[in-house]
From Swiss-Prot:
Its main location: secreted. GO terms for molecular function: alpha-amylase activity; calcium ion binding. It comes from Aspergillus oryzae (strain ATCC 42149 / RIB 40). Substrate binds at residues 56, 104, 143, 225, 230-231, 255, 318, 365. The keyword Hydrolase applies. It is found in: Secreted. The gene is amy1. Its EC number is 3.2.1.1. Belongs to the glycosyl hydrolase 13 family. CDD domains: AmyAc_euk_AmyA. Glycans are attached at residue 218. The lineage of its organism: Eukaryota, Fungi, Dikarya, Ascomycota, Pezizomycotina. This is Alpha-amylase A type-1/2.
Length: 499
């Protein structure tokens, strides 16, 4: 039986993973598969169970379901998963549906029974650790959730924050340019209000610090994704991050690096929204701007405290899926390659590998099981190949993850970048010409390879030879990404070989 080279390589690399740890330095080398627990996999293994995103109801995904599909995730080369919040939610079916997503919590000391039991969550953690993989859990410290108007909240339903004293006075955010409003007023609306905890109060602060340390300890969690970070005052976060004792990455939903990057001074990392917007715009059409992406790579690298601890993505449950803008598979391949080979920690959202095309919430929260989990889809294989070369480069080059990605070339339709220590660098060439793009040879300078050196293009498994002038003649066709690595360094890796 022929087995894909990336499958052989990834299996060998991950089974041999070292003992687990959960420091920021350890997370630099991870690659994250993000999933909504309710929408990824069911305990019964069904691939036909109905899940109409417009209904906004629980669809039946569970922690046990995730355990049963870890081969599917690990087969793409992911070393970690990020799951949505685990706390008990408001029980009602609101006018906006159920709290299937996990962001409308009411009891932080109980688990969401729709996903399973405490033993199930512990089993998920153990199953990941047995594979050398990490568990990241989503947490919310900013707010609770209530089925009703902000002016008529019954605070007694919240545990342990069971009185109005724990919360900011009711007011909805009207002006997002006013940081005081952003922090002190409420998200939500009068259909589902999100009572905003007053995290300046020691009693609230200490409760959260105790809780997060216990959560991490009880379920052997390796990292946290923190929701709505910009809605809590900055001085709350260092103590929270310290109490967690693991890598924390925060959601600061703002594309301005001058606003977003400073949050990395109060927690380990943030989601890279500054890159998200120019990345999306560069590849969502064949007329996108490479200039803006090129410039933002350099801005984030220079202005953020540590770009190697940011989370790179183009899809999540809050933003429309990439394929909702274009169904061009070549463009989707380029954007996925960027995510995995840029600085920081790659994050791929469940369903992205199957070219899901849901638009705004709730359409972008499709059930992964309805795809049937095929492992031969074009994006599944592309993601596996890109993760494989990244994982391999990390295993061979101790400086790879801290080397700052360097854009070395751009034109109207192309961007090229290099990452890694001299002699072991990966050079990635991305195009937004799309699947109908012409065939041509790009003469690439600045790659840092030596004249006459043989390179392997690890997506298509072809080779090129560096010219006598040091330029690399890169064959481009069909708008596809090219990822180069020194051929001699691949010896024994199984990359670009079959058995």
């Amino acid at each position: 039986m022929m087995v894909a080279w990336w499958s052989l390589f990834l299996y060998g690399l991950q089974v041999a993973a070292p003992a687990l740890a959960a420091t920021p330095a350890d997370w630099r080398s991870q690659s994250i598969y993000f999933l909504l627990t309710d929408r990824f996999a069911r305990t019964d293994g069904s691939t036909t169970a109905t899940c109409n995103t417009a209904d906004q109801k629980y669809c039946g995904g569970t922690w046990q379901g995730i355990i049963d599909k870890l081969d599917y995730i690990q087969g793409m080369g992911f070393t970690a998963i990020w799951i949505t919040p685990v706390t008990a939610q408001l029980p009602q079916t609101t006018a906006y549906g159920d709290a299937y997503h996990g962001y409308w919590q009411q009891d932080i000391y109980s688990l969401n029974e729709n996903y399973g039991t405490a033993d199930d969550l512990k089993a998920l953690s153990s199953a990941l650790h047995e594979r050398g993989m990490y568990l990241m859990v989503d947490v919310v410290a900013n707010h609770m959730g209530y089925d009703g108007a902000g002016s008529s909240v019954d605070y007694s339903v919240f545990k342990p924050f069971s009185s109005q004293d724990y919360f900011h006075p009711f007011c909805f955010i009207q002006n997002y340019e006013d940081q005081t409003q952003v922090e002190d007023c409420w998200l939500g609306d009068n259909t589902v209000s999100l009572p905003d905890l007053d995290t300046t109060k020691d009693v609230v602060k200490n409760e959260w610090y105790d809780w997060v340390g216990s959560l991490v300890s009880n379920y052997s969690i390796d990292g946290l994704r923190i929701d709505t970070v910009k809605h809590v005052q900055k001085d709350f976060w260092p103590g929270y991050n310290k109490a967690a004792g693991v890598y924390c990455i925060g959601e600061v939903l703002d594309g301005d690096p001058a606003y977003t990057c400073p949050y990395q001074n109060v927690m380990d990392g943030v989601l890279n929204y500054p890159i998200y917007y120019p990345l999306l715009n560069a590849f969502k059409s064949t007329s996108g701007s490479m200039d803006d992406l090129y410039n933002m790579i350099n801005t984030v690298k220079s202005d953020c405290p540590d770009s190697t601890l940011l989370g790179t993505f183009v899809e999540n449950h809050d933003n429309p899926r990439f394929a909702s803008y274009t169904n061009d598979i070549a463009l989707a391949k380029n954007v996925a390659a960027f995510i995995i080979l840029n600085d920081g920690i790659p994050i791929i959202y469940a369903g992205q590998e199957q070219h899901y095309a849901g638009g705004n919430d709730p359409a972008n929260r499709e059930a992964t099981w309805l795809s049937g989990y095929p492992t031969d889809s074009e994006l599944y294989k592309l993601i596996a190949s890109a993760n494989a070369i990244r994982n391999y480069a990390i295993s061979k080059d101790t400086g790879f993850v801290t080397y700052k990605n360097w854009p070395i070339y751009k034109d109207d339709t192309t961007i090229a970048m290099r990452k890694g220590t001299d002699g072991s660098q990966i050079v990635t060439i991305l195009s937004n010409k799309g699947a109908s793009g012409d065939s041509y040879t790009l003469s690439l300078s600045g790659a840092g390879y030596t004249a006459g050196q043989q390179l392997t293009e690890v997506i298509g498994c072809t080779t090129v030879t560096v010219g006598s002038d040091g330029n690399v003649p890169v064959p481009m066709a069909g708008g596809l990404p090219r990822v180069l690595y020194p051929t001699e360094k691949l010896a024994g890796s199984k990359i670009c070989s079959s058995s």
